[in-house]
Design a protein with these regions (language model features):
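Glycine/proline-enriched, intrinsically flexible loops and inter-domain linkers
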Residues: 1-270
Length: 270
């Protein structure tokens, strides 16, 4: 049996993985209870994150079907962070905790199998809006390096699968101007194989509006593996001042919001 633990502020998630014959058992016993915040995760999302890891480590032509996942069993205590019950808030469980579940299951299996270093570990949920418009996007970052090669840069990692909105589309449809949209060079962790770089997304608002950001990896860096260095932590700034990882605040005409998304962890010592 192999196991791992991750801290999802202010809670922890534990994962023990047992491979017995043709069965894989993933057990989240010891995970913190659900709480009043919105990082709680429904069991269906927890299972999806575990299935994602299994898909990554098996043949690429394996079909996504009930039969393919029949040998995989996922258990979690009722009412814990990764098996929340009503009336728990779960919005960030779907976007943020799911990413951390992927991290801990990969880390547990890393005791037995070659696995990638941690990727950016967040979806960097970004939203602007007022009575006239709403803009919402998840923003990519760096993928962790694999034992065979560098991690890709500026991509959606793990449970995220959305496309990046082109700068031209944003400026045509919204009262926003794109100041920077580029790779965050050097943010991937160093190593025999480098982690992918995150991105910089900088937007100036042309109307008064509200900003909401829901993100992780602003305090703790995506860890490297096998002597590889950690990826850079993410940052959220408004007019140059660093903000907390989760916030809602008023913006005024001319304010500038800048996302610097995390890089992926490196793999192996240089």
């Amino acid at each position: 049996m192999c196991s791992a633990c991750a801290i999802i502020r202010p809670r922890s998630s534990n994962s023990a993985v047992e491979i017995a014959g043709d069965e894989i058992r993933i057990d989240f016993t010891g995970t913190a209870p659900q709480y009043d915040g919105n990082l709680n995760c429904p069991l269906a999302v927890t299972k999806s994150a575990c299935y994602f890891v299994v898909r990554c480590l098996t043949e690429p032509d394996l079909p996504a079907s009930g039969g393919a996942f029949a040998p995989v069993t996922v258990t979690a205590p009722d009412g814990c962070l990764v098996n929340a019950r009503r009336p728990a808030a779960v919005v960030a469980g779907n976007t943020e905790t799911s990413s951390r579940i992927v991290d801990v299951v990969f880390a547990a299996l890393g005791e037995l199998l070659p696995v990638p270093a941690a990727g950016q570990g967040t979806m960097n949920n970004l939203a602007f809006g007022n009575d006239r418009f709403t803009y919402y996007e998840t923003v990519g970052g760096g993928q962790g390096a694999c034992p065979e090669g560098d991690g890709p840069s500026g991509v959606h990692v793990a449970m995220s699968n959305t496309l990046a909105t082109p700068a031209e589309a944003i400026e045509l449809e919204y009262p926003l101007r794109v100041g920077r949209w580029e790779l965050r060079l050097g943010s991937g962790g160093a190593g025999a194989h480098r982690g992918g770089d995150g991105v910089v997304r900088e937007l100036r608002v042309l109307e008064d509006c509200r900003l909401s950001v829901l993100a992780e990896r602003r305090r703790h860096m995506p860890p490297g593996r096998g002597g590889g260095e950690d990826g850079a932590r993410g940052r959220t700034l408004v007019n140059g001042e660093e903000q907390p990882p989760k916030l809602t605040r008023q913006l005024h005409v001319g304010d500038v919001v800048r996302l610097e998304t995390p890089g992926g962890g490196g793999q192996g010592a240089e």
